[in-house]
Amino acid sequence: MTKTAAVILAAGQGTRMKSALPKVLHPLAGRPMVAHLIHALGAVAPSRTVVVIGPGMESVADRVAPLPTVLQAERLGTAHAVAQAGEALAGFDGTVLILYGDTPLITPETLTRMVEARLAAEDPAVVVLGFRPADPLQYGRLITSPAGLEAIVEYKDATAEQRAIGLCNSGVMAVDGRVLFALLAAVGNDNAKGEYYLTDIVALARGMGRACAVVEGAAEELLGVNSRSELAAAEAVIQGRLREKAMEGGATLTAPETVFFSADTRLGRDVSIGPFVTFGPGVEIGDGVEIKGFCHIEGARVAAKATLGPYARLRPGATIAEGAHVGNFVEIKNSAVEQGAKVNHLTYIGDARVGARANIGAGTITCNYDGFGKYHTDIGEGAFIGSNTALVAPVSIGAGAIIGAGSTIARDVEADALALTRGPHEVRPGWAAKFRAHMRRLTGKN
């Protein structure tokens, strides 16, 4: 088995984000940027992964746990950052991937190609991931020859001829673990910033007589996120991928550009998704589900052939069983709607069970919170809840029971019973006309 390790550089302050949240924790498709890299690394199954963080970034350490983190106490450059992983990678003699926490769009396929290139017959010491950006102005150039990669030249130091080269440095590398830390130890800081640049290891490796190589990746994979606008650009890229994946997997998206997925959204076959639907993290949708427009779903499971929306909201803990209906302006939280049940209009179901084939009338509310605790409502199989009903939890409605419209139910109702609490119907003929006449005399108004 190929031995692989990874170092993720995540110590950057991210000042351009203007945020209290560390840059690498900003979410893309419902997942922190750094977590996208960790997920992509699964393709090469690293035996060790180390995340380099800066001072005050304990939240990053918490998020990447159980992966180990090492501290770059002073931000002295990328080579210095990688060197902080020396103890964690002591004795490792395989391929070390070096990634950046703010470059989250690299695909598993590209990482696999990087490792394969490192293990080629030429035995390159360093493999650099290059790309061809539409605007290459700011990037270092990769200087190649028939023998492979010769050097990386920063733009400010490049000649006019070198600046004309379109192949640019992404910073991502795969390095022979047997020489990585020796190369890093040889890097100097004789430059304008007084920093230790990781790019210098290419020339150092060539000076040792070792080959270096380039793998070319798509420019969109190497989009770095340093600002809110770049975060939005990265979101657009990943949403495009997720939409394509959904359609290739057998889902129909009526207006793909209006549907937003989380990275972990799971869709069955023949799912139909209308416009302006948003999937938060933790959603699983079964085969043949219809999701109409303007639904918002997070932390929920929906079984086969259920129908949602339009304008339905499923919150964490919602489970919708096969063939159930959740209609317009319905919110369901931490509740089970069982097989064939219908919750079709203007309803809140929270901390509840809606039994199979039960029917919940428009305007029904489960009153689950008293300001201190949440309480459960249980609605039995085949029960019928009339419109504009308040179910004051904790309360149980038996199977087959009928609740009259407009009721407030605060006590349990046995199976097959009728319960209603509204006052008796009263009609007073002519009363309205007499009232208006009386008020006109009092006010002098017509």
Swiss-Prot record:
Binds 1 Mg(2+) ion per subunit. One of its GO terms (cellular component) is cytoplasm. It comes from the Bacteria. Gene3D superfamilies: Hexapeptide repeat proteins (2.160.10.10), Spore Coat Polysaccharide Biosynthesis Protein SpsA, Chain A (3.90.550.10). It is found in: Cytoplasm. UDP-N-acetyl-alpha-D-glucosamine binds at residues 9-12, 23, 72, 77-78, 100-102, 140, 154, 169, 226, 315, 333, 348, 359. Residues 250-446 are annotated as: N-acetyltransferase. Its EC number is 2.7.7.23, 2.3.1.157. Homotrimer. Catalyzes the last two sequential reactions in the de novo biosynthetic pathway for UDP-N-acetylglucosamine (UDP-GlcNAc). The C-terminal domain catalyzes the transfer of acetyl group from acetyl coenzyme A to glucosamine-1-phosphate (GlcN-1-P) to produce N-acetylglucosamine-1-phosphate (GlcNAc-1-P), which is converted into UDP-GlcNAc by the transfer of uridine 5-monophosphate (from uridine 5-triphosphate), a reaction catalyzed by the N-terminal domain. This is Bifunctional protein GlmU. It comes from Rhodospirillum rubrum (strain ATCC 11170 / ATH 1.1.1 / DSM 467 / LMG 4362 / NCIMB 8255 / S1).
